[in-house]
Design a protein with these regions (language model features):
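A short beta-strand micro-motif common to beta-rich folds, especially ectodomain repeats
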Residues: 14, 54, 64-77, 163, ...
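Short strand-coil-strand connectors
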Residues: 37, 74-78, 115, 124, ...
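Surface-exposed binding patches on compact interaction domains or structured appendages
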Residues: 24-55, 93-94, 116-164, 222-227
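Surface-exposed, short loops/turns at beta-strand junctions within beta-sandwich domains
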Residues: 60-66, 157-159, 168-175
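Short beta-strand segments
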Residues: 78-82, 92, 108, 185-187, ...
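Interdomain boundary/hinge segments at the C-termini of tandem beta-sandwich modules
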Residues: 82-89, 189-195
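Solvent-exposed, low-complexity, repeat-rich "mucin-like" stalks and linkers
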Residues: 1-33, 90-125, 196-226
Length: 227
């Protein structure tokens, strides 16, 4: 997974002070209450009396765009707001690191989770003669490479996606290797070697008594011998 910020929970203490008398000592005169907090914030206490420290905890956040809010501390008819902000991050967490196809050809899915606004994908030139890319699928909706994801779900959370790649049958006796590029990152694709093929024509020869030369045609995808 690639992320540009840490995703651990963070707690910040908010100090709440009482009034101060003429010699500088705190005077515990007023009760306080914390109100109007964002739903994603947890407070260790929402009310108390006098000088206090309250832990303000933000949970793991997987959105791409930051979020903000505030909490309000009230003492009698006095109010003070504390601004709260949590940074977003770019998340790219793929469950597929490579794709391996059988010799007869098949379709396989490249899957993962991300919060990007769009995803680019393509078959590289070293595999373009035998591999094709389908559509990007997010929540049953299909998208072309680079198209914006409807509703931008990644702004506030990760979403799952899949891209289907289809390999044609391998007509050679060699393993085929190439690459796909998804979100600017290269991933390896391979295909098992195909079966050897052989066709000979004609399959019988008849020669004149005086002798003559005739030809047979050999069609194959690998080395051959005659015995």
């Amino acid at each position: 997974m690639v992320s540009n910020s840490s995703l651990d929970e963070r707690a910040t203490a908010v100090e709440i002070g009482g009034l101060v008398d003429g010699v500088g000592a705190p005077v515990m005169r007023a009760a306080y209450a914390l109100r109007s907090k964002p739903s994603w914030i947890t407070l260790s206490s929402v009310e108390g009396t006098g000088n206090s420290r309250v832990d303000v905890t933000a949970p793991v956040y997987k959105g791409r765009e930051g979020r903000s809010g505030s909490i309000t501390v009230s003492v009698e008819d006095l109010k003070e707001d504390v601004a709260i902000q949590q940074s977003g991050s770019n998340i790219w967490d793929v469950t597929t690191q490579s794709l391996a196809f059988v010799k007869t050809g098949e379709a396989k899915k490249f899957t993962g989770n991300t919060n990007l606004a769009s995803i680019t994908f393509a078959v590289d030139s070293d595999a373009s003669n035998w591999l094709t890319a389908g559509k990007l699928v997010v929540a049953t909706k299909q998208y072309n490479s680079g198209a914006a994801i409807e509703g931008d779900p990644g702004a506030s959370d990760v979403y799952s996606f899949e891209i289907t790649f289809t390999a044609a049958a391998n007509p050679t006796v060699s393993i085929r290797t190439g690459h796909i590029t998804v979100n600017g990152q290269k991933y390896t694709v391979t295909q098992a070697a195909g079966d050897a093929t052989l066709s000979v024509s004609p399959t019988s020869l008849t020669f004149a008594a005086a002798g003559e030369t005739k030809q047979i045609s050999i069609t194959t995808n690998t080395a051959w011998t005659i015995s």
